[in-house]
Amino acid sequence: MDERLVSSEADNHESVIEQSLRPQNLAQYIGQHKVKENLRVFIDAAKMRQETLDHVLLYGPPGLGKTTLASIVANEMGVELRTTSGPAIERPGDLAAILTALEPGDVLFIDEIHRLHRSIEEVLYPAMEDFCLDIVIGKGPSARSVRLDLPPFTLVGATTRVGLLTAPLRDRFGVMSRLEYYTQEELADIVTRTADVFEVEIDKPSALEIARRSRGTPRVANRLLRRVRDFAQVLGDSRITEDISQNALERLQVDRLGLDHIDHKLLMGMIEKFNGGPVGLDTISATIGEESHTIEDVYEPYLLQIGFIQRTPRGRIVTPAVYHHFQMEAPRYD
């Protein structure tokens, strides 16, 4: 799969950069107003009662700030954040080691929690519900179960695929919050804030131009800002102006809707070779040289969100909006 500027996934290097850009409290966090307002109430109530915050599940598309919110929850509660991920916990013993190392009140953040193995989930149930850990010592007839008490803690789980969570795990979260895509105005505020952190001057039209092409996702907005900053430093006087931002984004092949060259290849392939569809996923895969699951999981969600493709029983079709975007005449069916 080609590297994409508009991908909502983060690589390891980018995760380090994101950490330096993260707001430290709810007041600094831009967007997600309903989620913030509710978390403010839950956090304040827990602090007033001198209790740990109830377990929190954050779900929604990647790149919207789930990890940042987990860090903010820990900061607001005045406790430490311990971070891991579903794929990193391979055995029940791995989870037991993490849980027994927690201090009272700590926040344990598990990213991609939907990827936990079922046997590991079963260890997590009593830990979440009763703050205890059941460990089996020995094997065969002589095996016995020992219960270890754990300090009270808050589990913050994050997932992009909440439907893959088992019902027993999902039901143990007292707070469930869905993160939504951001508005252009919110993304422009994020771009402006990030530019301040980078000590780069940017005007409002430029921030809006970057926001418009960021697919509703802060991670994409910050990535595009970093690349536009490169153009401003090399081709200009380090200030990000509207001309610089438009020129940079055109050279980066990110159009005004946030579509990149791969999106264009997919959509134009459907139009030119299949008259706009319907066409099956495997056929699209063979046509553009990408895996079917990559198309379905990576490329399609945004195209579906903006109404550029539709899924039908007979396959995918492009909508009239695609022809309008590419300034083409839509076919007429008599």
UniProtKB/Swiss-Prot annotation:
CC per GO annotation: cytoplasm; Holliday junction resolvase complex
UniProt KW Cytoplasm keyword: yes
Compartments where located: Cytoplasm
Reactions catalysed, as given in the entry: ATP + H2O = ADP + phosphate + H(+)
Documented EC number(s): 3.6.4.-
Region named Head domain (RuvB-H): 256-334
Span list, region Small ATPAse domain (RuvB-S): 183-253
Cleaved signal peptide residues: none
KO phenotype (gene knockout): RecD2 is synthetically lethal with ruvAB.
SMART domains reported for this sequence: AAA
Residues that bind DNA: 311, 316
GO biological process: DNA recombination; DNA repair
Record-linked InterPro entries: AAA+_ATPase, AAA_lid_4, DNA_helicase_Holl-junc_RuvB, P-loop_NTPase, RuvB-like_N, RuvB_C, WH-like_DNA-bd_sf, WH_DNA-bd_sf
Amino acids binding Mg(2+): 67
Keyword Nucleotide-binding included in the entry's annotation: yes
Binding site for ATP: 21-22, 63, 66-68, 129-131, 172, 182, 219
Any one GO molecular function term: four-way junction DNA binding
Subunit and interaction comment: Homohexamer. Forms an RuvA(8)-RuvB(12)-Holliday junction (HJ) complex. HJ DNA is sandwiched between 2 RuvA tetramers; dsDNA enters through RuvA and exits via RuvB. An RuvB hexamer assembles on each DNA strand where it exits the tetramer. Each RuvB hexamer is contacted by two RuvA subunits (via domain III) on 2 adjacent RuvB subunits; this complex drives branch migration. In the full resolvosome a probable DNA-RuvA(4)-RuvB(12)-RuvC(2) complex forms which resolves the HJ. Homohexamer which interacts with RecU.
HAMAP family per the UniProt record, alphabetical: DNA_HJ_migration_RuvB
Domain comment in the entry: Has 3 domains, the large (RuvB-L) and small ATPase (RuvB-S) domains and the C-terminal head (RuvB-H) domain. The head domain binds DNA, while the ATPase domains jointly bind ATP, ADP or are empty depending on the state of the subunit in the translocation cycle. During a single DNA translocation step the structure of each domain remains the same, but their relative positions change.
NCBIfam families xref list: PRK00080.1, ruvB
Sequence similarity: Belongs to the RuvB family.
Known function: The RuvA-RuvB-RuvC complex processes Holliday junction (HJ) DNA during genetic recombination and DNA repair, while the RuvA-RuvB complex plays an important role in the rescue of blocked DNA replication forks via replication fork reversal (RFR). RuvA specifically binds to HJ cruciform DNA, conferring on it an open structure. The RuvB hexamer acts as an ATP-dependent pump, pulling dsDNA into and through the RuvAB complex. RuvB forms 2 homohexamers on either side of HJ DNA bound by 1 or 2 RuvA tetramers; 4 subunits per hexamer contact DNA at a time.
Name of this protein: Holliday junction branch migration complex subunit RuvB
Organism of derivation: Bacillus subtilis (strain 168)
Lineage, broadest ranks: Bacteria, Bacillati, Bacillota, Bacilli, Bacillales
